[in-house]
């Protein structure tokens, strides 16, 4: 999301409560808020597409449709070719939506019923077309005002057909409040949803715009508060991670700093044939400033790990009991453990995890460390499951986790006192009694082998310096995502996990400069 947005994310219930408070104030009514919303959306449309000669609003039957009717009236008054295609006849509307439709029609806005057999089209039609374009001015931009934030059931006809027409129009799309068909709480698509280029959301930033499939469908998000007072900070349950939080979580270095102050990290992993995962985690810990990183791995993996000369390597015996005994000695002098990258799922791995648990050290549990049955992880630990691992921890399925990621995070927090990072597009970070966080940065290049190992190592490296599992997790998630963005801007596809690790210092420098 390139635009600067507030950090607070609100549920539908919280937004409705704010709206009720605003309407209780003297001199404010529903039509006033509707006019403010329409004006904000019109201003954003003209800013985003300054050459637009007009727009067509697809209006549904509720207040979201009312916003659309009002926007058409304001657009007409501004000299644009603004038109309405409605799925619910204006004479059947109620309240503010009815008043907005009446105002729009009185202003001379052309309004016709949506015809699913014709769709929207891009051919010149009765509304006229500029010479040589073949596209009617009113089709320069399509405005989605079909469904608002209250939808919780799958989209039905005729709205579903109107959404399909918008998505197949080939025109720029601006959505009002949320893209129609997207759950404003979970970010789940309810059968079918509008794919918007820009979404102007009203009063507050909704959680569903950043959760799940929300970012894919919302496009660039802009907020119009409509002069409604924000929710008190003590009532906020979700926030998006911003640069200020990250900056505060990165320990500053004095000019006379030495490596001993960077903390000692032990990576436990690198089973036979899986040296790369442990090495990536170790490199990431170094890249964020850890003072010393030791990789405890299988003897067969030691040479591959040692190819990174800055890493210390401790080969472990093949015998599980002997390996666990040796590992306990190493953990006794470590400040932080990162367990799981390339660890494996055999008795050797299980014995090492037992030693990790017995050490009591702050620990990042990742990858194979999350495969085995896990009792309640304590508050000094960080769990980093991807959706499949989260499903295993919860005894569910990946599809259920992805259908409602915030609910999955809450379920994990019910079971563990640890910080939990639910990885994926829009990674979530939570811990009991804290405001949960969502990362709105990142790029699909992060969906590559080894990037999770890099994230685990980065968390461990920051934790070794700060001693704060929460701050380390929040900062590492954001830095990891930002590193991916920076590389994607330069290289596009084909970015390797090792390159993500190498880009972490630049991401840190960037946030520390701002």
List PLM regions with ranges.
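Small-residue (G/A/S/T)-rich helix-start motifs and N-terminal tracts that mark the onset
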Residues: 1-88, 94, 98, 118, ...
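Conserved nucleotide-cofactor-binding alpha/beta core module
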Residues: 99-102, 106
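A conserved beta-strand/loop element that lines the FAD pocket in flavoprotein oxidoreductases
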Residues: 109-113, 177
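Intrinsically disordered, low-complexity terminal tails and inter-domain linkers enriched
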Residues: 112, 116-137, 435
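Internal gly/pro-rich beta-alpha loop/helix module
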Residues: 140-141, 146-236
